Regions:
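Short glycine- and acidic-rich boundary segments immediately preceding or forming the N-terminal edge
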Residues: 13-15, 19-49
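Active-site-adjacent mobile loop/cap segments within catalytic or ligand-binding domains
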Residues: 215-277
Length: 487
């Protein structure tokens, strides 16, 4: 368990996180379940984990698959989160990352597969051809697993590239199935699909992006269609839309729909949409749970880079979160929340006052905060939209520049590299880093003490030893100021 040693860090450039101790904090009654983990295709290069959560109480068996298409990550991430939900009845089986190599390479197809087998979701049996077998190792292994587990329900989580409701494809092109529920229409499935659509659409404000029902049934040779027609199972494909929406939004949409489905089936007894990781345990091998903000005001590429950097650190579970996730029910599951580069003011506007208060409460309860560039502006105590987590004043405002007119002082030019030096305190935190180093810089905050009521003085961990200057009034204002602080 963690949450006892975290502080707030403001980074003008880059970050690494360690640490903490407090419970799951959700008040969820977790039934006594039997948990089983194994590998689909064990020993093969493409092997991928599956998870079985058996409540030991009579109820339906449900299979959830994600990541069959590698460029559709929201389904894989949602499935990975859903596998941690507390099951009250029945058995929940989850294969989150079926096409693992495709997900790693962000490609729809199976990397290096022959052309006729590269689309994994066209490799399954068909009732129209009883002699047809699954094509390729992955489809064969997954199909054998489905047959062996014998679920009553199969939910395959996908993403389309455009919103079906508003997509207008060119002549001869197929309409995208993004933001839809695909099923073969019958009374049982239609009633459930309507309930899922109703609830998820409450979270969608743009009418052109709302979910639609496609009762025509899944395409032939897809996993869902084969499960339906060959094995006679209830099967659905849930589609979000990966263009124009950030990853946490789409992942939450999948969780929302599956929450409706599992509650209607009597498998969960409480709202689980906000459950994104496993419950806390007293296991000494517990991982640090890090939330990365990935929504308006934050660079999506920056969020990707933060996640990549964390893969090689202390055992870490990373969750990408959006503005709707800035609530106690989600944050209480984390050890650290990271806000990366972008615009601090836009991040503040996106999370809103309730989200800001949730972040403050999370930190006050012992959670960690890492602010990088835009996130460092956000956690300062300077602006009326600031979180007031660190006692930092920000060098900003406008100055008159000859031949230019008023110039904002926070703008220092294009991305460059500057030199920083660790302080004695910084060397204890960043023991694996050299004393002086070049780091990437792009208009991060130049800070000094604010003396904000209720905040303790910050501790500098690194100092700028060079500076970037765009206008004469900026000269000398960056050198020897903090590059990284903790508070």
């Amino acid at each position: 368990m963690f949450r006892h040693a975290f502080r707030t860090f403001a980074f003008c450039l880059f970050a690494t996180v360690f640490g903490t101790d407090v419970g799951f904090g959700q008040g969820l009654a977790t039934p006594v379940s039997r948990l089983e983990t194994g590998m689909l295709g064990a020993g093969r290069p493409w092997q991928t984990p599956y998870y079985i959560n058996d409540s030991n109480v009579d109820g339906p068996t449900v299979l959830i698959t994600g990541g069959i298409h590698g460029n559709e990550p929201a389904g894989a991430r949602a499935a990975e989160q859903i596998r941690h939900w507390p099951i009250a009845r029945g058995k929940l089986i989850v294969v989150p990352r079926v096409n693992r190599f495709g997900l790693d390479q962000n490609t729809r197809f199976i990397p290096n597969a022959v052309d006729e087998q590269k689309d994994l979701n066209r490799n399954f049996p068909s009732s129209e051809d009883p002699s047809r077998l699954p094509r390729g190792e992955i489809a064969s292994a997954l199909w054998d697993f489905v047959v062996e587990q014998d679920p009553q329900w199969v939910f395959d989580l996908h993403e389309g590239y455009e919103f079906n409701r508003s997509h207008q494809p060119k002549a001869g092109k197929e309409k995208s199935v993004g933001s839809s529920v695909i099923y073969a229409k019958n009374e049982t499935l239609h009633e459930l699909a309507q309930s899922m659509q109703l609830v998820v659409n409450r979270t969608v404000t743009n009418p052109n992006r709302k979910f639609v029902l496609l009762g025509r049934g899944p395409k032939l040779t897809t996993l869902a269609n084969a499960s339906r027609t060959v094995l006679r199972k209830n099967a659905m494909i849930l589609e979000t839309t990966y263009n124009f929406q950030r990853l946490p939004t789409r992942t939450r949409q999948h969780r929302t729909m599956m929450d409706v489905a599992l509650r209607r089936l009597g498998m969960i007894e409480v709202d689980c949409v906000d459950v994104v990781v496993a419950p806390r345990t007293d296991d000494g091998d517990a991982q640090v749970v890090v939330g990365i903000y990935d929504d308006s005001g934050c660079s999506e590429g920056g969020a990707n880079n933060i996640e990549l950097a964390l893969r090689d650190s202390h055992p870490t579970t990373v969750v990408r979160l959006g503005s709707r996730d800035m609530r106690p029910q989600v944050l209480d599951q984390l050890d650290v929340m990271v806000f990366g580069g972008g615009s601090g003011s836009k991040q503040a506007a996106s999370i809103g006052k309730e989200g800001a208060e949730a972040v403050r409460s999370f930190v006050a309860a012992g959670g960690g905060y890492v602010g990088i560039c835009g996130g460092a502006y956000l956690c300062s105590a300077y602006y009326d939209w600031s979180l007031n987590l660190v006692d930092t004043h920000v060098f900003t405002g406008s100055r008159d520049v000859e031949g230019h007119g008023p110039a904002p002082m926070w703008v220092r030019g294009e991305t460059t590299h500057v030199e920083v030096q660790l302080t004695d305190e910084g060397r204890t935190v960043f023991a694996d880093f050299p004393d002086r180093m070049k780091v990437k810089y792009h208009n991060g905050p130049i800070v000094s003490p604010r003396l904000f009521p209720g905040l303790t003085p910050y501790t500098p961990l690194a100092i700028y030893r060079s500076e970037q200057v765009l206008h004469p009034p900026q000269k000398g204002t960056m050198i020897d100021t903090p590059a990284i602080v903790s508070g």
